Swiss-Prot record:
GO terms for biological process: axon target recognition; axonogenesis; flight behavior; grooming behavior; jump response; peptidoglycan recognition protein signaling pathway; photoreceptor cell morphogenesis; positive regulation of JNK cascade. Its EC number is 2.3.2.23. Belongs to the ubiquitin-conjugating enzyme family. This is Ubiquitin-conjugating enzyme E2 N. Catalyzes the covalent attachment of ubiquitin to other proteins. InterPro entries: UBQ-conjugat_E2_core, UBQ-conjugating_AS, UBQ-conjugating_enzyme/RWD. It comes from Drosophila melanogaster. It catalyses: S-ubiquitinyl-[E1 ubiquitin-activating enzyme]-L-cysteine + [E2 ubiquitin-conjugating enzyme]-L-cysteine = [E1 ubiquitin-activating enzyme]-L-cysteine + S-ubiquitinyl-[E2 ubiquitin-conjugating enzyme]-L-cysteine. GO terms for molecular function: ATP binding; ubiquitin conjugating enzyme activity; ubiquitin conjugating enzyme binding; ubiquitin protein ligase binding. It comes from the Eukaryota. The active site is at residue 87. The keyword Zinc does not apply.
Length: 151
């Protein structure tokens, strides 16, 4: 860990000592810039009861550039495509070095509670979300049961 910037060490320590409710982020034992993340589907959302695996990677120039984050678990969501890429302003143009790993994880958790079909990455999902929200929510619940609920 000594070759890591102090900021990454501090953020990692804080994540371990003060975990975010519903989120578990563990640094990889071979690469402290890579995190194995588990996000629990928020209550009262179509993703409730789901356990979603994500990967988070801090690029060499972090915090000048945003972390790279993607869902590994399949999810039916207008802002997350089939490859797990996430459409979230703080991961793109709204990124600021003042933000931290925990801010990003909280933003992703909030995105699960409030999908935004007006800024989609998965156009087909967003379209259904706009024209028949009830069916889209049903699909999201089905995918959650199928892909994100541990037996």
């Amino acid at each position: 860990m000594s070759s890591l910037p102090r900021r990454i060490i501090k953020e990692t320590q804080r994540l371990m000592q003060e975990p975010v409710p519903g989120i578990n982020a563990i640094p990889d034992e071979n690469n402290a810039r890579y995190f194995h993340v588990i996000v629990t589907g928020p209550n009262d959302s179509p993703f409730e009861g789901g356990v979603f695996k994500l990967e988070l990677f801090l690029p060499e120039d972090y915090p000048m550039s945003a972390p790279k984050v993607r869902f590994i678990t399949k999810i039916y969501h207008p802002n997350i495509d089939r490859l797990g890429r996430i459409c979230l302003d703080v991961l793109k143009d709204k990124w600021s070095p003042a933000l931290q790993i925990r801010t990003i994880l909280l933003s992703i958790q909030a995105l699960l509670s409030a999908p935004n079909p007006d800024d989609p990455l998965a156009n087909d999902v967003a379209e259904l979300w706009k024209v028949n929200e009830a069916e889209a929510i049903r699909n999201a619940r089905e995918w959650t049961q199928k892909y994100a609920v541990e037996d």
